[in-house]
């Protein structure tokens, strides 16, 4: 496996892979890789001939008071995991490499997708995501790109972007990977104290209970979100940002009664750490 840092090197690697007729899988990450990322890289390795993992803590998706400087950076460990899972190249550019101009060119999905859920408190976040992913798509020219369902709102934005900008690739969205105790894998879990980690288990428990309500026939979104909110509020260390349901695709307002496919998403702070989780509620 090769570790590379420049756009020129990545272009060279991709040109060689294309010349050999290899299919390319891209796994965009911000590093601090865990089993969730490992599952994406393994899927990319299974479905493509040549796998690129990008490791880039993208400054444009962090707001002024967010954790850009504190975000974990573990490139050596990331490379070991990527290699073990079958990556051919790890692309770890500097911010200057990815944003060469003094002024920026933005790729932005408009409408509801970037405004609801996390978009209310992180107004520039999704613009940063769609811009950096566009750059990575242009550089790696993948046949398939891999993302986790945990970042469901990001996935909806990227699906819209791929469709609207005619990117010739398939977005592969892989299931949420959880710890044995149910907590969704996240690079930010490393910030949690032991007590906060235990408290955060209320997220997966409350989503599981909501899914059971839905499967038992409940179709009133307000009743489901109220039940989840009540569950989470029983945990004294929790500080809820949102508990909401939107229709899929596109995070449209939910119908009452609920029909089709719907996303139940939560964002909750434990101490200073904000965690997200979700479950899709749909007819079997």
Each model region followed by its residue ranges:
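Nucleotidyltransferase catalytic core that binds NTPs
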Residues: 2-237, 246-250, 280
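Phosphate/ribose-recognition catalytic cores of enzymes acting on nucleotide-derived substrates
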Residues: 227-284
